[in-house]
Structure formats: structure tokens, C-alpha cells
């Protein structure tokens, strides 16, 4: 009986420690992420994700552009306060909250089209990659991108 009690306490302690560390270190999307262009497979931008009061926000920190391209483009297709704002510094990911497995309930903006989609994100491959999905209505009707954590 005493051994079963000790084992139960050990299992409970490990479960609590595991859930606490699940969002520590690489198990949080907070940090810098490299986005990859779907067509070319080349790096497109760096997005810095921050967390405030349990809500994630992602802002474009850097663009990887050819020398002959505008190095500081504006979001001319965006609406509202983002209209004609520089893409560098633009908040493209907002409102994501952790639900125990992934971050859901947010929005993502595509600066190329100016469209805003519902969004969710999930850490994969031990926290080295972030699967970001933008969708209309339900997640089934959308598109995913895999972002790579910058070290």
C-alpha cells in the first residue's frame, strides 16, 4: 500500500513537471522564426513571436529580398490600420492562445494579398518547427506553412 502511494505521488509529480516544462524552452513558439517561400523553398522572412498575458503575437522583423527588389515594401493590399504600412514591423499573427496542445483562435495576415485568415499553430519536431495554418471557416479549408526556429 505504501509503495502504491509513493508511486502515485511520483506519477503526479512527473505529470505536473511535464506540463510545466511543455511550454518552457523550445516548447513555446516565443522566439524568432524563419518563414519559407512556398514556390521557391527559399527563406522569405523572419517573424518574431512574443507572448503577453497568454496571447501570442508575431511581427515581421526582416525580409529576405533580391537586391533589385524594394527592401522596405509597404502592405498596399492590407486594410485598416495596416494599409500602406511597412511590411517590416507589421503584426501578421495575433490572438493565438494555448489550448493544451496547440495555439488556436488567432488570425494571420498575408501581406502579399492583404487577406486576414483565422489561424492556429502547433510546435512540431521537438519545438524546432512551427506548423502555422491559415484558414477560412474551419481548419480543413486552409493552407499550412512550416516555419523554422532561428537559433
Regions found by a protein language model. Name each.
Residues 1-9:
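Bacterial N-terminal signal peptides that target proteins for export
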Residues 127-129, 135-151:
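Edge beta-strand at a domain terminus
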